[in-house]
Amino acid sequence: MYEWLNALPKAELHLHLEGTLEPELLFALAERNRIALPWNDVETLRKAYAFNNLQEFLDLYYAGADVLRSEQDFYDLTWAYLQKCKAQNVVHVEPFFDPQTHTDRGIPFEVVLAGIRAALRDGEKQLGIRHGLILSFLRHLSEEEAQKTLDQALPFRDAFVAVGLDSSEVGHPPRKFQRVFDRARSEGFLTVAHAGEEGPPEYIWEALDLLKVERIDHGVRAFEDERLMRRLIDEQIPLTVCPLSNTKLCVFDDMSQHTILDMLERGVKVTVNSDDPAYFGGYVTENFHALQQSLGMTEEQARRLAQNSLDARLVK
């Protein structure tokens, strides 16, 4: 069934470009930029990819991102991901990038953006993959820092379709960023936000009511709140679910416990995505395949999940 799933036309709506940094590319960029790494080789780094929670993953993720320095580095990162998409018949992507991860270490905003945009444009021309780029604020930093990032983004407003919110969830509720999201909407941006991954269902309510998001990224803990489930179903609010990420970060102990197919059958507009595939062991097709292997997902369910991803695009 893997080949059939691979050939299914699909969109990816929850993908962090920095999370596609495969160990081989990470080492190549470190060499290009003369950066000493704490790992001796690719295999040693792969062994470090054992996380018990979101924070342990984020610590490694931010350390890895340090090799990204030049416009060419960001181009190469994005282009490598788009080639994976082409191989898996992902026809539309709406990736996140985290400018603060780079500007906080002295990389100019415009350098980061130029490399990513050039690769996305080439992906559309050469690979036929359409896109919409999402600028994501880091929630472990202050709202003031997010406002500064929005200031940096405004001269390039035509580069983005939306703003988002990611990084350490617990202790950083969506309400912390209500003003910057209000401002982003007034500037013409759509909004999305990570909520209900490690954080409680209340964070999903806040993302909907205070940040006024078009989509919820993750959202799996909505299953704990029946009133919230009814709202998601009634309003057909998409959830960008990331099964392999959820098991790798111990949101679910095992894929057999995942609720995505239960939510699908209840009528929630769930989609399948890879989140940070270099770190979590699989791109979109591998996430579909894991659901088939562990939960017995049928072809009909896979078709619905793929169609949901196409329907839930911000860029039609």
From Swiss-Prot:
Gene Ontology biological process terms from the UniProt entry: adenine catabolic process; hypoxanthine salvage; nucleotide metabolic process
Coiled-coil annotated residue ranges, if any: none
GO cellular component, one term: cytosol
Note on cofactor: Binds 1 zinc ion per subunit.
Annotated binding of Zn(2+), by residue: H14, H16, H194, D275
Active site location: E197
GO molecular function, one term: zinc ion binding
Residues holding substrate: D276
Record's function text: Catalyzes the hydrolytic deamination of adenine to hypoxanthine. Plays an important role in the purine salvage pathway and in nitrogen catabolism.
Family membership: Belongs to the metallo-dependent hydrolases superfamily. Adenosine and AMP deaminases family. Adenine deaminase type 2 subfamily.
Name of the protein this chain belongs to: Adenine deaminase
Species for this entry: Pseudomonas paraeruginosa (strain DSM 24068 / PA7)
